[in-house]
Amino acid sequence: MLGGSATYFAASASHHTPVRAVGVIGSDYPRHRLDVLAKRDVDLSGVEQADGESFRWKGRYRHDLNVAETLETRLGVFASFRPKLPESFRDSEFVFLANIDPRLQLEVLDQVRRPTLAACDTMNFWIESRRDDVLAVIARVDLVTLNDGEARQLTGLANLVQAARWLLDHGPRHVIIKKGEHGAFMFTRESVFFAPAYPLEKLFDPTGAGDSFAGGFMGWIARTGDLSEGNLRRAVVYGSAMGSFAVEGFSIDRLIEIGPDDISRRVTEFRELVSFDRELPA
């Protein structure tokens, strides 16, 4: 099954903007499986194929689908991967450092020239094993996105508002804390914004929802080039919309099936979810 942070991110973001992907796959990975992304204006010239096994993550969800239990992480070719950005990638204005070894995230940052907005994600595996490197990445980006459990784990603070303030004190201007089916918060030093999750009766697989959220968020920002507070809030809603599509199917199936009209309708439905100043039927 096609997976990986970059895969979900690219499938989501490509609905809004061309994407340049950087990563590595093993010799066991049929490269033609990536054709579905290439057809969506995703430049794969930064994806290397190396001898060895592809990265693999194994996990399970119990009653609470907001929490993934990691059963196994096999780095494979990622263990020796050193990202080398094509020269044509180095002028990228909007950079998202997906969930990989934070040392590799730092290497990517060292190769891009002057990004307008750099954002990063991480996970419990890296927080446990390379916390100092995770903090080094956070100190260099404009925005960090992570889920509520990761925010608590990284900061040692149970209160999410306090955790967000702690993260803001360590470098980024914006912190997004995702709470799965309960929505997402965006914090700055001056403001707090909340977007609900889309209410779904049927959910197939929550894997990749966070990366799809990031793709929707960064894709919208790259499309508009607008870093105003209002547009960042709209980007959170677009991220939530894309995440809601991702969980409606397995792998990136739904992200490939949908079109602009589907996205517009869902964003409108998000607006209706939080509208309280219009007249309602008696």
Model regions and ranges:
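Short catalytic helix/loop segments, enriched in acidic residues and glycine
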Residues: 1-11
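Conserved phosphate/ATP/ADP-binding segment of small-molecule kinases
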Residues: 114-117, 124-194
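A short acidic, amphipathic alpha-helical/loop segment
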Residues: 33, 104-111, 132-136
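Conserved N-terminal subdomain of the carbohydrate kinase-like
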Residues: 15-97, 109-115, 264-282
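Short beta-strand scaffold segments in enzyme catalytic cores
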Residues: 11, 57-60, 183-187
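Short, conserved phosphate/pyrophosphate- and ester-handling motifs at nucleotide-, phospho-/glycolipid
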Residues: 13, 147, 210
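Alpha-helix C-terminal capping segments
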Residues: 9-19, 220-222
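Conserved phosphate-binding/catalytic region of the ribokinase-like
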Residues: 160-282
